Amino acid sequence: MARFIDPRVDWAFKRIFGSEDTKECLITFLNGLFEDELVIKDVTFAKTEKLGLRPDDRGVVFDVYCITNKGKHVIVEMQKKEQEYFADRALYYTARAIVQQGIRGIWDYHLAPVYTVCFMDFVSQSPILKEFRTDLVLTDLQTRQRVSDRMRIVYLQLPLFDKHTEAECMDIFDCWIYIVKNMNMFEQMPFSEKYPVFRKLAEIGDLRKLSRE
């Protein structure tokens, strides 16, 4: 019998990354993912449901949506089942988070950056997604220079993560991906001595404790 929950399942993913009580998990994961580029000390969780701008517009429901202490917007999604246009879906979600920043009346169009992080428990057929990690940003075609930091999408294809043992994991980001892929198979939570956040994860993800709640 499994000891821990499976982070790739919707409710478990939200329990780990989308709760005020467990936001340390989200913060350490994001800091590991973006390293020194995005240093997060705290996050405020926002409403995950965004209605359309007009009555006939389609709304969206994010898995996790938060705003960092520096005002950056972060969306985190887990997609377990293969979806043909998931790359486009992530773009749509990012665009919605940008558009929702618009206000009526006098506005200078200053936008807060939006980061969308997509866990994918499948290998996409999209030609732009060939590696475990793909980062999409706005760049100039000629110079290849980044022209705006207002939008970034990170796709993480879990089946392409090539570190299969604890010893191969070199930093906290590697550890997080290894755990997300394999947590439901663990008897003990790895990396707990090196990174205290994983002791917290072991507590909130223990199925025995959940059954008593």
Description of each model-found segment:
Residues 1-213:
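Elongated, amphipathic alpha-helical interaction scaffolds
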